[in-house]
Design a protein with these regions (language model features):
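Phosphate- and other anionic-substrate recognition elements at nucleic-acid/protein interfaces
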Residues: 1-9, 13-156
Length: 156
């Protein structure tokens, strides 16, 4: 397992959830929620620098049948734009099926009501995404997901 902090990004239509791993890549935690739109990529680039991120994982919405629709196209666009801003830090796309559903369930079990969940579910979904990516790397011995073209170096 490569050492270094990883960030994960769950892009929603209103908010962008961000999660962060520990330096050993064992545990993912919700980190920040950013309003989607003007300035969101700037903030993601700042976080990448501030956290000295090894890589950034962007959630790729995929249907149960494995198809990618409009949301996946939007996620790919965000990933490409982010990759151009933070190069040479790699950006990877990773399947985000069930992340929001799982995050809602975990928050509900933790006693959060619907209103409280709304503000943090995006970061919690990013944490679910990042934990899955970390577990995937641990199981396979390879960086998770699909490297975004033009994203710079591949982290060793």
């Amino acid at each position: 397992m490569r050492r270094g902090v990883r960030l994960a990004v769950d892009v929603g239509s209103v908010r962008v959830g961000v999660a962060r791993s520990d330096p050993d890549g064992v545990l993912a935690s919700p980190f920040e929620v950013i309003r989607h739109g003007r300035g969101d990529l700037d903030r993601l680039a700042e976080l990448t620098t501030e956290q000295d991120a090894l890589e950034v994982i962007v959630g790729l919405p995929t249907t149960l049948a494995g198809r990618q629709g409009q949301a996946a196209t939007a996620a790919r666009q965000v990933a490409a734009e982010l990759a151009a801003r933070i190069a040479p830090v790699p950006v990877r796309l990773f399947d985000e099926r069930f992340t929001t559903t799982t995050a809602h369930a975990v928050l509900r079990q933790g006693g959060k009501n619907a209103k409280a969940r709304r503000g943090i579910v995006d970061a919690a979904a990013a944490a679910v995404l990042l934990q899955a990516a970390l577990d995937n790397e641990r199981a396979t011995g390879h960086p998770p997901g699909e490297l975004v073209p033009g994203a710079g170096r591949i982290a060793p």
